[in-house]
Structures are given as C-alpha cells and as structure tokens.
C-alpha cells in the first residue's frame, strides 16, 4: 500500500507499522455493547473510533472484515463471576422476556449509530447465537489442562496457566497484583483461586437464560464469547482487536489467556484501545449511573445539558481528541465543537462559490495540505491534527471568497476532493438534514420578532418605524400581510 499506517499496539506499548497478516485482507474485531439499556456517550466513542479505522483501511484499499459483537448473555453485574445477568435482571424488572430487552435496546443502539453516521460492521454476531462455539472453546481449554469443573461450573485455572505463560501481559499486571485486588465474592469457594474466571456457569433455578452443556444447564462466561466468535469469523489469527481501555482488564486479558490456552498462541496481532469519556474526571458508564444517553444529547433532555446537540456535533467532539486521550464532558466543549463543525461545513459550502483563477496565490499549497492530512491519519489515526489541517483549509477558502487570494481550477478541484475525502469519507462527518431546517426556523423567529416590533410601533402610531421594518423585509424577499389577529408572512422564493 502507498501509505504506511502506524497504530499503537497496547500489547507492546508502542506504535507499530501496520502489516496485515494476509494483505489485502484485514480482520478486525471490536467489542460491542451489552444491550440492556440505551447507548450513552461512552458507547459512541469506540463505535466512532473504530468506524474511522474501518473507513480509513477501506480507503487505503484493504478488504476489511469488521466484526462487532453484541453481548446478550453472560455479562454479570460488576463484571464478576457472581450476581445476576445484566439482561436477565432488566427483563425481570420490566417483566419481559430477555430477548425482548435485547431486541428493544439493540434497535435503539442501531438507530443511534445510524444518527452518528457509524457504518454497519461486516458481521454483528450475538453471544446467544454462538453457545455451541463457546462450549467447544471451554472443552478445548479443559482438554489442554488450563480449566477445571467445580459444582457444574467451569473455571479457568489462572495459576496453572501463569506457570507456562504470562497472565497479565496486556494489562501489565502480575498474578500477585491480581490476587491482591480480587474481591471476595459469594461463590468463590467453587474456585481454586480467587483470580480464576468463569468459562461456564451453572444456572441457578431462577436463572432464565440457560443452555445444556456437558457440565450443567447454564451459560457461558462473559469472556468466552469474543474468543469464540473472533475465531469463527476471523480465524485463529487475525489483525486487530479493539475496544475501550476499560476492557483491557479483565476482559481482554482473559481473552488472551483463553486463546493461548486453547491454541497455543494469541489470536490477535494488534490490540487497540480507545480511552474513556469522563464526567468531572470519573468514567461515564451505565454501571456507575453517571451517564448521559445519546438520545438525551440529541434531545437536550438531561439535567446536565445546557442544550440539545446534533449527532454530528457529538461525532466531531469525539474526533477532536486523539482516541487514546481522555475526553471530559462539558457543555462548553460541546458548544465549541458545534461552532467548529459549523465553520467546516460553511467552508465546504463556500467551495462551490469560488470562481477559479488562472493561478493560485502564493502561500496556498493544496497538495501539502492533503499530504499533512494523510500524515496525521497514518500516525495512529491522529484526527485532531486532520481537523487542524482542515481548519487551515477553511481559512484558505474564506480568504479566496473574500477576494484576498486566488486558486487555479486544478487546485480548486484538489481542495474539494481533500475536504470531501477527509471530512466525509474518512472522518464520517456529514451535513445534517436538519441543519438547514434549523437555520430556517431561526430565521423565522427573527422575522416574527421584527414584525412584533412593527406591531408595537403601529400601536404607538410610530408609522416611520413600522414602514421601515416592512420595507426592509420586502426588500429581502418577504411578503408581509396584516391580519385582524396580527400578521402573516411568507418568503417569496
């Protein structure tokens, strides 16, 4: 490929040149949501981060198989091996079938992703649809001697595995650290070691979601699904596994252990993780109860929101920070993103107003601008630098439209292509349909306000002001009609 992409590999803690295992094919697996509630801003970040990666790899000419799973079973409360299944709990509280809960929130998740202009993955497998594959994975680990059965459940033997391999190589932990921070929960007596994690859990009598297995009627542990489904759709070795930084431990650490225990080596070449979105320095999350749903952002209905924010404002807000940086929510930051996005969209609209000249003014170098955008993307998806370059492009467009600079037809064509490529195709931004409607609504409010001022002027027999307002609006193309109830107006198009 022409462009050399480097990405930060969490496993090796450094940026590495991206070299696919089977070019031009790329296999990418990203951990999707556990669907027991509405998607929030924290869900938007990995979706947008890996959407940009998907878009860019595709642009570079790779044939990407992008797998993003749906967790609809096995994810217990507090990410532990005890407690109630998150989806089953929601179903019990709402007196629904678990799959009703899954389908309802999955539909809403898809709707939110569509609003954010997140492309659909190539495959979106459900954990509940791959129970057989997870049972087969558990059996392989048992056969290899790295798991044991206990009272109908099957646990991964972390201590035994750690003698042969390194448990903790992704997160940088050692087993003693893990043991010191492992909580003493109910049911730990089934385990040989508190750090052991469930591969299969025997279902209690009241547990709704259960499947038969060689060990018990039960359900798979949370970590099993991604290893099993990644292997099924991407093979025993694939290029990229992504997710939020909060998944490094225990989820992705356990995935590596399962992979190595069942096949002798790690399935994944590059581990990529986006950082968190925080509120007042604390991670935003459903389990913490401090989240704002995407619908609440779009509608402005949450008490912490000063206003509603469009999906593209949210997307732009996320892309203005590097994906490995923490982003702290604030209305001020979102409002700044809103203004910045509007500047870019207006600049793109301004491209169509430019009349090309014979030559391009000195100091305008479109090819360099395009090269710098590529350079930023190739440097571990540095979208903030891409945006900075596009703002420089916006400055150039505004200067040309103001008559302070000129641009040749060839350079204008390149500039248009650069903006459309990086703004729309790669970063996935778009001009929202509602934006022009919103502007028209705002204009309408201004006209109403002026005509109300005119009514006051007429009531005060200030005919000069009344006529001035009417004549000004008429000159701007508005037709004003006085009625017994006040006034009517329309814009003559």
Swiss-Prot record:
Its cofactor is Zn(2+). Keywords: Aminoacyl-tRNA synthetase, ATP-binding, Cytoplasm, Ligase, Metal-binding, Nucleotide-binding, Protein biosynthesis, Zinc. It catalyses: tRNA(Cys) + L-cysteine + ATP = L-cysteinyl-tRNA(Cys) + AMP + diphosphate. InterPro entries: Cys-tRNA-ligase, Cys-tRNA-synt_Ia_DALR, Cys-tRNA/MSH_ligase, CysS_C, Rossmann-like_a/b/a_fold, tRNA-synt_1_cat_dom, tRNAsynth_Ia_anticodon-bd. It is found in: Cytoplasm. Binds 1 zinc ion per subunit. Zn(2+) binds at residues 31, 226, 251, 255. ATP binds at residue 286. A motif ('KMSKS' region) lies at residues 283-287. It is an enzyme of class 6 (ligase). It comes from the Bacteria. Its EC number is 6.1.1.16. Belongs to the class-I aminoacyl-tRNA synthetase family. HAMAP family: Cys_tRNA_synth (MF_00041). Monomer. This is Cysteine--tRNA ligase. It comes from Bacteroides thetaiotaomicron (strain ATCC 29148 / DSM 2079 / JCM 5827 / CCUG 10774 / NCTC 10582 / VPI-5482 / E50).
């Amino acid at each position: 490929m022409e462009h050399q992409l480097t990405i930060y590999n969490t496993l090796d803690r450094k940026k590495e040149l991206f070299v696919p295992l089977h070019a031009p094919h790329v296999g990418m697996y990203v951990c999707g949501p556990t669907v027991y509630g509405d998607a929030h801003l924290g869900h938007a970040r990995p979706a947008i981060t890996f959407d940009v990666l998907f878009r860019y790899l595709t642009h570079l000419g790779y044939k990407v198989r992008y797998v993003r799973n749906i967790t609809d079973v096995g994810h217990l409360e507090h990410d532990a091996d005890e407690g109630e299944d998150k989806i089953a709990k929601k179903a019990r509280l709402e007196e629904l079938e678990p799959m009703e809960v899954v389908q309802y929130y999955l539909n809403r998740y898809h709707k939110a992703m569509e609003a954010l202009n997140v492309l659909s993955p190539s495959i979106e497998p459900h954990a509940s649809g791959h129970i057989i594959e997870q049972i087969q994975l558990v059996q392989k680990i048992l056969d290899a001697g790295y798991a044991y059965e206990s009272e109908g459940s099957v646990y991964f033997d972390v201590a035994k595995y750690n003698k042969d391999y390194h448990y903790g190589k992704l997160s940088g932990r050692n087993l003693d650290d893990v043991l010191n921070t492992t909580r003493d929960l109910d049911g730990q007596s089934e385990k040989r070691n508190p750090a052991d994690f469930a591969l299969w859990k025997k279902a209690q009598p009241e547990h709704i979601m259960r499947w038969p297995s060689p060990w018990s009627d039960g359900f798979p542990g949370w970590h099993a699904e991604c290893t099993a489904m990644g292997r099924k759709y991407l093979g025993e070795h694939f290029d990229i596994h992504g997710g939020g930084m909060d998944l490094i431990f225990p989820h992705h650490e356990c995935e590596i252990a399962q992979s190595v225990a069942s096949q002798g080596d790690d399935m994944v070449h590059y581990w990529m993780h986006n950082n968190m979105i925080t509120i007042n320095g604390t991670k935003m999350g459903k389990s913490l109860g401090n989240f704002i749903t995407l619908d609440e952002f779009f509608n402005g209905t949450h008490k912490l929101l000063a206003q509603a924010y469009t999906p593209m404002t949210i997307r732009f807000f996320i892309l203005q920070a590097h994906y490995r940086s923490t982003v702290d929510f604030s209305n001020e930051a979102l409002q700044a993103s809103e203004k910045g996005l509007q500047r870019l969209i207006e600049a793109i609209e301004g491209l169509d107003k430019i009349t090309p000249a014979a030559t391009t003014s000195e100091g305008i170098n479109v090819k360099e601008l395009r090269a710098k955008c590529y350079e930023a993307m190739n440097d571990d998806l540095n979208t903030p630098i891409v945006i900075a370059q596009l703002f420089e492009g916006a400055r150039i467009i505004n200067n040309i439209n103001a008559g302070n600079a000129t641009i040749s037809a060839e350079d204008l064509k390149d500039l248009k292509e650069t903006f459309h490529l990086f703004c729309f195709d790669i970063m996935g931004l778009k001009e929202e349909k509602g934006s022009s409607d919103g502007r028209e609504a705002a204009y309408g409010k201004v006209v109403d306000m002026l005509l109300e001022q005119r009514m006051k002027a007429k009531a005060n027999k200030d005919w000069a002001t009344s006529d001035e307002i009417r004549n000004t609006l008429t000159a701007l193309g508005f037709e004003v009609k006085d009625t017994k109830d006040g006034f009517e107006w329309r814009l003559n198009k």
